Regions:
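C-terminal substrate-binding/catalytic lobe of Rossmann-fold NAD(P)-dependent oxidoreductases
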Residues: 56-64, 68-194
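A generic structural signal for alpha-helix starts
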Residues: 38, 139-140, 200
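NAD(P)-dependent Rossmann-like dehydrogenase/reductase catalytic/cofactor-binding core
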Residues: 178-226
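N-terminal Rossmann-like NAD(P) cofactor-binding subdomain of oxidoreductases
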Residues: 1-86, 91-93, 111, 184-187, ...
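Low-complexity, flexible helical/coil segments
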Residues: 10-15, 19-20, 69-71, 95-102, ...
Length: 226
């Protein structure tokens, strides 16, 4: 159960790069997205809005890898770095708590229900999220995807679009508010493979909150985040 359902009903859910108008800036309460959903929605929502992707239920497969800081600061042997070093493990499959958030926002973007297969993993790094998305998209080209991204993110300081065949690296976004994305097409399978990385503690959490505050106050969105 939500601890404050009355407040939840008033909140505006905001990834600033995905907002289509400025109405949210006058809101009293902003709900900042989760870390995994941010790494997933930034590359996919513009494509769903454009109608490029129409995945069948369960055919949109998302594998994400998070650093141990994603578990918070609770004292748990499983999350000690000495326990995780040299080891990767899946967790929360099926039914991770972020699935509802992801599917809700994808449904809004696509104008119809979208069912995802989300597979989170715990990786041996302090911070960062690496996401790989596999989606059937026969006939959709890399150029079409890149054109949608370029239109959606023109002038946005925290989105880096890499050339097809270049793959984002968590080390390149660590300690920043940036998200980096790329796409390749697999002609053999008819799938698009989209990759993205963020810092789970900044773009995936506190940094995005500061970015939202900056925009609400009419300040430069990168204030305090450069």
């Amino acid at each position: 159960d939500h601890p404050a359902p009355a407040l939840a009903a008033q909140a505006h859910y905001v990834i600033p790069e995905l907002q289509t108008d400025d109405a949210w800036k006058s809101a009293k309460l902003i709900a900042c997205p989760g870390c995994y959903p941010t790494s997933i929605q930034v590359p996919l929502v513009p494509l769903l809005r454009a109608g490029l992707l129409k995945p069948e239920p369960g055919r949109l497969i998302i594998n994400s890898y998070s650093g141990v800081s994603g578990a918070g600061k609770k004292a748990d042997v499983a999350f000690l770095f000495c326990e995780r070093d040299g080891s990767i493990k899946a967790y929360g499959i099926p039914g991770h708590r972020h699935i509802a958030e992801i599917e809700e926002q994808f449904g809004v973007a696509a104008g119809q229900p979208v069912v995802v297969q989300f597979n989170p993993h715990l990786a041996p790094m302090h911070r960062g999220i690496a996401t790989t998305i596999v989606v059937p998209a026969p006939g959709v080209t890399v150029a079409q995807v890149e054109a949608v991204w370029q239109k959606a993110y023109a002038g946005r300081p925290f989105v880096t679009l890499l050339k097809s065949g270049e793959f984002p690296d968590t080390a390149h976004v660590a300690n920043t508010n940036r998200v980096s994305c790329s796409v390749v097409a697999d002609a053999r399978t008819g799938n698009l493979i989209i990759t993205s990385v963020i810092d789970n503690l900044l773009k995936g959490a506190g940094g995005q909150a500061v970015q939202n505050l900056n925009l609400m106050m009419g300040w430069d969105e990168s204030e305090g985040l450069r």
